[in-house]
Amino acid sequence: MSARPTPDVDAALVLGMASTALPFAGSREEEAERWLRILRLYGDAGAALQSLGVSEGPLEGAGGNGKHGAGAGDDTDVLSAVSEVAVRAAEGRGAPTVAAGDVLVAVIEVYGEDFDRVLRVHGTDRAEVLERLGVGRG
């Protein structure tokens, strides 16, 4: 039996920063925006997002349907869910460590349409991000 993958430095930084940023989000979409702003700065996730032109600020107006308060619940649960899915992504790659790209894949899975909307506002989409990461379509 092989050891469970552990976060590399970039993934640990992303998860740590998210743990301090998420409590200030008013909705799941705002949480997704915070994840994106963090992920674009670290590791393979950052390289993929920046190569797609994802910048600090959104290309489109961000206002609108943030669903304030709806779903911005227990940050510990969402961090645990993202961490668990990231570990599975790393295991799927046969990697000994969880990379920032695995965290990005996990955020895409856990946040679903909320993260898809955030990606669109930044001028990209799930398929482009996963392709840039070298992950099968999801």
Regions found by a protein language model. Name each.
Residues 1-138:
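Histone-fold recognition with a strong bias for associated Lys/Arg-rich disordered tails
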